[in-house]
Amino acid sequence: MNNFASNDPLVIAGTVYSSRLLTGTGKFKDLDETRLATEAAGSQIVTVAIRRVNIGQDPHQPNLLNVLSPDRYAILPNTAGCYTAEDAVRTCRLARELLDGHRLTKLEVLGDKKTLYPDVVQTLKAAEQLVAEDFQVMVYTSDDPILAKRLEEIGCVAVMPLAAPIGSGLGVQNRYNLLEIIENAQVPIIVDAGVGTASDAAIAMELGCDAVLMNTAIAGARDPVLMASAMRKAVEAGREAFLAGRIPRKRYAAASSPVEGLVG
């Protein structure tokens, strides 16, 4: 942990993290590449699709936990692939059993297979049920400020609005909505989905997001390990720029050199 990270930690559900880059574990060519990219990203929280990745469900298949140990990483099970609140809740219960009572979970309930936008009605329903069952819910949602606040009020420990559709690589498409969500939030706001390259991650952090979660942008790159390293630096730079405070935008030039005492 560097000095800057130790003085500016990310806190989720009372747990302190020095890294603000969360990474997924899907789409890599093999578990070794997953491990190398995760290490290069410097991530402390890694998300796992319970319906797609083996963490003990199948004893005859390679187990992700053998390369990404829960002793080193916070394993964040997610409900990717769920289209109803009932399926999502059932998946979270399975994850808790597989991870020995693990409470932190990433909720996502999708609306359709084309856009992979969240079904906000089903998301709210599932969030209420999971919070009632004492899960610590980090929730994937749209960039609707009203919905984001409602999810916070339900008891979600982090709200994760999309920057753009999952896997699209389009970057932040609606800065205004993200700013509204950030300014009104009392829990961490983590951009989830849509990042394509390092500048996208930096922009999200410059806006004031607390962290960024990504998978495809790293796993789908020509060199996933190198891209993971780039994303790590982008998130750190974006956070520092946010804290430093950018200069205001102006229509006209403003000289950077003093005009007093000019010769001639």
From Swiss-Prot:
Identification of the protein by name: Thiazole synthase
Keywords from the UniProt entry: Cytoplasm, Schiff base, Thiamine biosynthesis, Transferase
A GO-annotated cellular component: cytoplasm
GO biological process, one term: thiamine diphosphate biosynthetic process
Annotated metabolic or biological route of this protein: Cofactor biosynthesis; thiamine diphosphate biosynthesis
EC numbers, comma separated: 2.8.1.10
InterPro entries for the chain: Aldolase_TIM, Thiazole_synthase_ThiG, ThiG
Species per Swiss-Prot/TrEMBL record: Xylella fastidiosa (strain Temecula1 / ATCC 700964)
Cell compartments where the protein resides: Cytoplasm
Entry-linked HAMAP family: ThiG
Taxon lineage: Bacteria, Pseudomonadati, Pseudomonadota, Gammaproteobacteria, Lysobacterales
